């Protein structure tokens, strides 16, 4: 396997250079690999869970009212989707009376009702319809009964019963709920859940692996957006995501990013997992090879880090703990496409230039600095800058951190890609950089050289 090594040196120069625009360089393969910018229309503060499930329209008959309420309530208990909650609220009268089996929750407000059924949703591992019927019916009013089975988080089986009454709101043109009663007893619902997640970490990891292999990265499968949205069952609104050559993002942006990146990919292979733990934190390393276009193969590497997460905060009860992913890290994509030595070198050099510029423009952060460092062969590295020699990688690493912090921005001015001796290829680039401390500017020539080792 061929290995690419790099060394750099920096030389202050005072001569002027012509302006250079990197977009004039059309490195097709590089652009195809890293054309992964986050869409501009992704708001970071939107609702974390969004259901794309179809529903019955606003109910104009008693049967429609029963069907719509049953569907929305059961869907929410299964998924806690804020979209399903909004659909329930469409049916509620502003002064609706809501009663549950908990004495402290008697006569609930809408906010308390939301917390209550969210609590139930976290307490139940499984929910499904048992029976439903209309008990009383007229042209302007209806009373219904809903019974559904439950499987509790401790494996115990049970059921709940709800009674709902609604009347036709002539002004709105559809039925609205006036009263809602939970008829079940609460003796099996503890106020103090277990201090440990009900689902063992082994089960959570097994579920994640199945999701990745049999759904999101399924070879030859149909990849609907809902497959990527199902990752919301594994991450939290606070999950941190770091994507090489793209940057930091939140959970919503990550789901959109995966959908845009892989939604049309059909060929996947070589799914590899490695599992490790460090105290209460668990890590799942995952690798997959995919064919983005006919004959163009790439390999992605991810690390999913998970720990115990407080699933829901409810006014009347202590909180549940679940396993959730708190951080996702995607390492730099590796090309598995066969190409000539010259083409591969040009791509590598263009990538090195881009990461160097990113590191200075975006400020020192894990994603930009780490992506740049990953390009070096640390065991064979050597270089120098402004008269300072780096005998090993550690010395350069220490210098690089301070250098990156000092400069506020780096503006590419000129570049040159060259090849010689049929085995080595490199490039140099001139950057005009402004110092963060005093706004002074200086021009540096950055030189990278790489070579193949058979």
Curated annotation (Swiss-Prot):
Entry keywords, A to Z: Signal
Higher taxonomy: Eukaryota, Metazoa, Ecdysozoa, Nematoda, Chromadorea
Origin superkingdom: Eukaryota
Name of protein: Uncharacterized protein B0228.8
UniProt KW Signal keyword: yes
Secretion signal span: 1-18
